Amino acid sequence: MLAVALLVLLCASASANSIQSRTSSYSGEYGGKGGKRFSHSGNQLDGPITAFRIRVNRYYIVGLQVRYGTVWSDYVGGTQGDLEEIFLHPGESVIQVSGKYKSYVKQMIFVTDKGRYLPFGKASGTSFNAVPLHPNTVLRFISGRSGSAIDSISLHWDTYPSHCNTC
């Protein structure tokens, strides 16, 4: 009798795990193979993405920094070029990232759930278009490779954090 009860409990647990919805997905890597790896995976614990600082020159994206909640990530990339900064509105999220690349990331265009279109860089190279695989998910963090420029970029998607009331 105990064996039957354990079997039923095990089957119920396996069934519950199999129907648990998935929310995270990954897009990338777009760009070249150079540079040193970086990841903002730990930064997502500070909150949702709330702003971008992106340095561009006339050829490609040189560097980037992302604000998670109220905390800026470490800057990655080079120092040459113009620094552009854009803040998201409270509760606004990135739901699509498209752009161009060759050996470096040349362009990134962030599209938000409020209909805003935020372009950085130059439109030349191979196109990419990154969207989450699962509904009701947003851009949570960025990873990639960088040196004197942003060599490649990857986008990581998941649900908007429920613990951030002021973001």
Swiss-Prot record:
Signal sequence coordinates: 1-16
Gene Ontology annotations for the cellular component aspect, listed alphabetically: collagen-containing extracellular matrix; Golgi lumen; mucus layer; zymogen granule membrane
Cellular localisation: Secreted, Extracellular space, Extracellular matrix; Zymogen granule lumen; Golgi apparatus lumen
Molecular function GO terms recorded: carbohydrate binding; peptidoglycan binding
Domain Jacalin-type lectin: 24-159
Organism superkingdom: Eukaryota
Main location: secreted
Similarity annotation: Belongs to the jacalin lectin family.
Protein name stated in the entry: Zymogen granule membrane protein 16
